Every structure is written in C-alpha cells, then in structure tokens.
From Swiss-Prot:
Keywords: Cell membrane, Cytoplasm, Cytoskeleton, Disulfide bond, Glycoprotein, Membrane, Signal-anchor, Transmembrane, Transmembrane helix. GO terms for cellular component: cytoplasm; cytoskeleton; sarcoglycan complex; sarcolemma. It comes from Canis lupus familiaris (Dog). Interacts with the syntrophin SNTA1. Cross-link to form 2 major subcomplexes: one consisting of SGCB, SGCD and SGCG and the other consisting of SGCB and SGCD. The association between SGCB and SGCG is particularly strong while SGCA is loosely associated with the other sarcoglycans. Interacts with FLNC. Disulfide bonds are present. This is Gamma-sarcoglycan. The lineage of its organism: Eukaryota, Metazoa, Chordata, Craniata, Vertebrata.
Amino acid sequence: MVREQYTTTTEGTHIQRPENQCVYKIGIYGWRKRCLYLFVLLLLIILLVNFALTIWILKVMWFSPTGMGHLRVTKDGLRLEGESEFLFPLYAKEIHSRVDSSLLLQSTQNVTVNARNSEGEVTGRLKVGPKMVEVQSQQFQINSKDGKPLFTVDEKEVVVGTDKLRVTGPEGALFEHSVETPLVRADPFQDLRLESPTRSLSMDAPKGVHIKAHAGKIEALSQMDIIFQSSDGMLVLDAETVCLPKLVQGTQGPAGSSQRLYEICVCPDGKLYLSVAGVGTTCHEHSHICL
C-alpha cells in the first residue's frame, strides 16, 4: 500500500488546505493469495516426494558409478554376476561365463536361441523344451575338441564320424531304409541279430560279404527256402564234418520206374557232382569233372 500526502500553504496566511490522501493497493489478496500459497506448497511436496523416490530407486537398484546391481559396465561389454532373469528377448553377439564356473540357461517353459541374417530372418534355431530338443538349420554338426566332425545331419544324409557307433537299447536300431557301413558286429559275448519282421533282408557289397563268429555259431533260420547261389564261382563248405540230419528217407518204388535217379560223388578236393545212378556206383565213370 502506498499512501501519498500533499500539504500546501500560502505565504502570509495561516489557512491550511484540507489534507489530500490517495491510497494505492499493489499485490494479491484474498482467495488468490491463498491459492498461490497452496500451489507453491503442493510443488514443494511433489519435489520432496520425487527426490525421496529417486533416492529409494537408486538404493534398491544398487546404482553405482560402475553399473547397476550385479550388472557392471566394462571396456569389454557388460558383466553380470549371480543369477539374472530376462523378461524379454536378449540380443547379444557373445555370451560366456566366468573362467571358474559354467554357463546356465534356465527357463520354466523353453530356451530358444535364434540366429538371424541381415534382413532379420531366422537362419538357425535351437529350442530346448520340457519334452524335446529341436534344431532348425540347414546342417547340424557336432565336433570334437580338436574340430573333428563326430555327427553331421543334413537333408541328404547322416554322417557319424566316430570310430564306432554303439546302440545299447533293448530293441536295437530300427532303419526304414538302407544302411551303408563297412562293419556290423555285436558286443563281446552278445548275439548279433539282423531282422526284418515283415519284409526281406538284403546285404550287398561289391567285393564280398563276410560273416564271422569267433566264439560261437551262425544260424540262418527261414520258414521258406534258404538259397545259396553263386553265378560265377562255387559254394564251398570248408568243415571236417558236413551233416544233413533231416534228409527225407526214400521209399521203394515200382519196378521199371522211368524216374531218373542220381548219386552224389565227391572229388579228392571236396568238389561235389552228380552221377546217374545205376545198379552199382557210377562215380568213377564221371570222375573226369575232378580233373
């Protein structure tokens, strides 16, 4: 409030003019002043609350000059100590654990690792789920510590690079198509069975098929015929004793039967040949085949 007072007198007279007072009011008064104070007080309260929340967040998140919590920012990248949980996809060029500990990736549902090209398309995927492990790629390969391929799979073939492939299941191995291998053998003192329940079983090799049993016997069982056929060579039974225990015994036929009979003859080197049967042996007459 400004108050101005003007008093004038005239020389030689004692008459005093009436006092002239002018009052000017400058400022905010009334409800406006109260609202202004209330607004300023509200701003101070909000400022204090924000400052307290900032201090609380810094304390809870363990912010420090080197990082946040277990997350440390180094010149080589980011370093996490302890267990970490990612709620959204993680994009990284390289992930490795400490020298003295292993790397563990764990999820309640599945763990998926994707490889993308420059256009963002998935070119390779590894998915570990609760019931299966799925690999989606053009080629899947497992190498040894020295870089040697141990197991390779693509659309055309499966290659096992180890010296030995061992199947320990009670039902063995089931192959729907052909198998190419230089050697098939069982474990020591175990039986080797090659079986085709509903179809035929064929073994082919350009330089021969060798079947050996060093400490046991070899059995070939068939409900129908067993045929041994050699187109250019011979069938050799190299044994001290050859037994045919279940040959059918012949019966006496009518006299003068025109049925032709043969006898089996043996050369000194073990070769067998047939000779027309007669009243006596005729092997000597046809022995020129042994020459």
